[in-house]
Design a protein with these regions (language model features):
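Surface-exposed amphipathic alpha-helical tracts and adjacent flexible/coil segments at the periphery
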Residues: 1-22, 26-37, 49-52, 58-86, ...
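Conserved non-cysteine loop/helix-boundary elements of the Radical SAM core domain that shape
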Residues: 38-42
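Glycine-rich, highly charged phosphate/nucleotide-binding loops
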Residues: 43-48
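Alpha-helix capping/helix-boundary segments
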Residues: 99-100
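RNase H-like DDE/DDD metal-dependent nuclease/strand-transfer catalytic core used by mobile genetic elements
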Residues: 104
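Short, glycine/polar-rich helix-capping loops at beta-to-alpha or helix-loop-helix junctions
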Residues: 122-126
C-alpha cells in the first residue's frame, strides 16, 4: 500500500527548510499574489524557483496556491503568476476559481490542478464532478466525518484531507464575516479572523462563541491511508517554521510507526494550541467541547526554549537521497567519478593524470572516506565502489573536487522534474455580450455608496 503523503505548509523559505528536513513529502506555498494567506510572507518569482529547486533536489513536491477569487482586471497579472509557477517547475496548482483552472490549463496543459478546500467540496458528487473536469486532486472540506471521507474515496481521484491546524467557524470558501465587518475577504486571502474575537450568546458576556479549537486527526492517519486518502495536509502557512517542523514530525511518526512519541506530542501542543485540539468533525461528535481560545497557559508553553530545541532538530541537512558512487583511477589515466540516484547519472573526469606514488600511495579506504563527505548536501552515499590501481598517487583535493562537481550537476538534474510546455502567447479574451440593464436600476446602483451595504 502506498504511504499517505505528508503535506506541510510553508509561508517562508525557512518553513520550507523546516518541512523538508523534518520529513515532509510535499509542501504547499503561495505566490505574492492570489494566495488565500496574503499575510504570509509568500514567494516572488525567484524565491519560488529557489524553493522548488531545493524541494525537488530532496525528492519533495511543491504545490502552489492560486486559490482566491480573481477579478477581470487581474487576469493579465494572473497569467504571469501561472506562467511563473510553471517556469519554476512546481508539481501542481491549488485553485478555487474555475476561471483560474481554465486559464492554467490553457497556459500549461500538463500542469496538474488541485481543487482547493475553498471550493467547499464535501460530498462524493462534488468530488466526482471535479474529477470529470480533469482535476488530479481534491482537497476536502475540514468539516467532514470519517464516513463522508470514505464515500469520497470511491471516486478514482486523489484526495487530500486536513489532519492538523486551525478550524474556521464557517466552511472554507463560504464565510463572509470578515468581508462584511472589515472589508477583508477570506476569498481574497485577507481574512481578519473576527471569529476569534469575544462574542456574547444570550447576553452572556465574555465568551468566544465562534472560536473553535484546532483540528487534529493525526492519530487517524492509518485509517485515512487505508481508506485511500492520498495526502495528509497540515494547516498553517502563517505559523512559525518550528510549528511546521513539530507538526510534520508528529505526522511522520504516526504514519511510519503507528504512534507519536511523548516528546513530539509535547512539542506539538507547545508550539500552538487553543486549549487543546479537537477531532469532533471526523468522529462525528460535534458539540460545545469543540470550542477553545488561545489562553495564557497556551502562550506560556510556547516559550523560546521549546522553539530553540525544535530549531536544533532541523538545523542540518538530512541526507535523505540515496546515491551510489563509482570511482575509477588507473595509472597514467584521468580519474573518473560517476554518481547515480537511480534515475539520474552524472559522470566527471578529472583534469589531471594519475601518477605513480613516490612515498605513500592512496588506498581505497581513503578514497571512500573522501567521497562519503556529503554532510552539507541532500545526499547519502549508500554504496561507494572503488576501482583503483596499486601504488598510485591522487591528491585528496582532486577527489573532493570531483565529488562537489558531480553532486552540483546532480542537483541541477534533480531540480527540474517536468519542464512544462508553456503557451506564453495565449491571449485572454472577453465576451462582447453585455446583459441589458434598465437605466433606472443602473442609476440606483451607481448612486449607492459602499458604506450603505454594511
Amino acid at each position: 500500500m502506498k504511504k499517505i503523503e505528508i503535506l506541510a505548509p510553508a509561508g517562508s523559505f525557512d518553513s520550507v527548510i523546516a518541512a523538508v528536513r523534518s520529513g515532509a513529502d510535499a509542501v504547499y506555498l503561495g505566490e505574492k499574489a492570489f494566495s488565500a494567506r496574503s499575510s504570509a510572507k509568500n514567494f516572488d518569482d525567484e524565491e519560488l524557483k529557489k524553493a522548488t529547486a531545493y524541494c525537488h533536489i530532496h525528492g519533495v513536491k511543491v504545490y502552489v496556491t492560486i486559490n482566491t477569487i480573481v477579478f477581470d482586471d487581474e487576469l493579465e497579472k494572473l497569467k504571469k503568476a501561472i506562467i511563473s509557477a510553471a517556469e519554476a517547475d512546481v508539481d501542481a496548482l491549488i485553485v478555487q476559481n474555475m476561471g483560474v483552472a481554465r486559464l492554467a490549463h490553457r497556459l500549461a496543459p500538463d500542469l496538474a490542478l488541485h481543487a482547493s478546500t475553498q471550493m467547499s467540496i464535501h460530498t462524493a458528487s462534488g468530488v466526482k464532478a471535479l474529477y470529470e473536469m480533469g482535476f488530479k486532486r481534491v482537497v476536502l472540506a475540514r468539516e467532514m466525518s470519517k464516513k463522508e471521507i470514505e464515500k469520497c474515496c470511491e471516486i478514482p481521484v486523489e484526495l487530500e484531507v486536513f489532519v492538523h491546524g486551525a478550524l474556521c467557524m464557517c466552511v472554507s470558501g463560504q464565510c463572509y464575516l470578515s468581508a462584511m465587518i472589515g472589508a477583508r475577504s477570506g476569498n481574497r486571502g485577507s481574512c481578519a479572523q473576527p471569529c476569534r474575537l469575544p462574542f456574547s450568546v444570550n447576553n452572556q458576556k465574555g465568551g468566544h462563541a465562534l472560536s473553535l479549537k484546532d483540528n487534529s486527526i493525526v492519530n487517524y492517519l492509518g485509517e485515512l491511508q487505508n481508506m485511500g486518502v492520498a495526502s495528509a495536509k497540515i494547516e498553517g502557512r502563517m505559523k512559525r517554521p518550528e510549528y511546521v517542523s513539530a507538526a510534520v514530525r508528529a505526522c511522520v511518526e504516526q504514519r511510519d510507526f503507528g504512534f507519536i512519541s511523548d516528546k513530539t506530542q509535547k512539542m506539538l501542543r507547545g508550539v500552538f494550541s487553543r486549549t487543546g485540539f479537537t477531532d469532533a468533525y471526523y468522529i462525528g461528535k460535534t458539540g460545545s467541547h469543540m470550542f477553545g481560545t488561545r489562553t495564557k497557559s497556551d502562550v506560556v508553553s510556547a516559550d523560546e526554549k521549546l522553539f530553540s530545541a525544535i530549531r536544533s532538530s532541523y538545523k542540518d541537512e538530512i541526507g535523505n537521497v540515496e546515491i551510489t558512487f563509482d570511482f575509477t583511477a588507473k595509472l597514467g589515466e584521468n580519474p573518473v567519478l560517476v554518481v547515480s540516484d537511480g534515475v539520474h547519472t552524472v559522470k566527471k573526469i578529472a583534469d589531471t593524470v594519475t601518477e605513480k606514488a613516490i612515498n605513500r600511495p592512496i588506498d581505497a579506504e581513503k578514497c571512500r572516506k573522501q567521497l562519503e563527505k556529503t554532510g552539507s548536501t541532500a545526499y547519502n552515499p549508500t554504496d561507494v565502489n572503488i576501482n583503483i590501481d596499486d601504488d598510485i598517487s591522487i591528491p585528496l583535493s582532486i577527489i573532493n573536487s570531483l565529488r562537489r562537481d558531480v553532486l552540483d550537476e546532480l542537483d541541477t538534474a534533480r531540480s527540474v522534474v517536468h519542464n512544462y510546455k508553456i503557451n506564453r502567447d495565449y491571449e485572454i479574451t472577453f465576451p462582447k455580450f453585455t446583459p441589458p440593464v434598465e437605466k433606472s436600476t443602473r442609476a440606483r446602483v451607481t448612486q449607492t455608496k459602499l458604506s450603505n451595504a454594511f
